[in-house]
Design a protein with these regions (language model features):
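Catalytic cores of alpha/beta
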Residues: 5-16, 68-79, 108, 112, ...
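Alpha-helical structural signal in soluble globular domains
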Residues: 20, 48-52, 75, 79-83, ...
Length: 163
């Protein structure tokens, strides 16, 4: 479910996911509300989704972090946490690309309160190594399979990721 959809539509999509036996669902926050400073809406919608589906799904709240200033991103994180969120996927798609700065800010402010997944714009194995060095354990990229192959070749040649 994407953030521009109504809450009702996102809940229906999540119900569909549960009925088809998935155990995980990524849901984009209502970023138009967040961009308007309506963090109360982000919080209430997150609460509705997590209350309804946390027992059946591992919910990953998607945050297009690059759209927000640092202050706004912190407010978004607070709203998601207050709404029951615990796992954030940062900047997937939309050509936004994750940045070390955004993820470091979220990690610094929220500590272990969230599982944080960088996503989007991760195009080089050295970027993966840097995220791993910074403590991130799940990294999303369209280049996952090429990274695996590149890492396999690196290991065969006796090399390793510099983390």
């Amino acid at each position: 479910p994407i953030g521009g959809q109504t809450l009702k539509k996102r809940l229906c999509d999540m119900d569909y996911v549960v009925k088809h036996r998935s155990d995980q669902c990524c849901v984009t926050i209502n970023y138009p509300a967040a961009l308007s400073g309506r963090y109360d809406i982000v919080e209430s919608e997150c609460r509705a989704m997590h209350t309804e589906f946390d027992a059946a799904l591992h919910i990953i709240d998607i945050v297009p972090a690059t759209l927000f200033s640092a202050k706004e991103l912190i407010a978004v994180g607070q709203a998601i946490a207050a709404g029951g969120g615990y796992h954030l996927k940062v900047n997937p798609g939309y050509g936004l690309g994750s940045t070390f700065e955004e993820l470091s800010l979220l990690k610094r402010v929220f500590g272990e309160q969230f599982i944080l997944d960088p996503s989007g714009g991760i195009r080089e194995l050295k970027d993966v190594a840097e995220y791993v060095r910074r403590g991130f354990t799940v990294i999303h990229s369209q280049k996952t399979f090429p990274f695996i192959e590149e890492f396999r070749i690196l290991k065969e040649r006796g090399g390793h990721l510099n983390v």
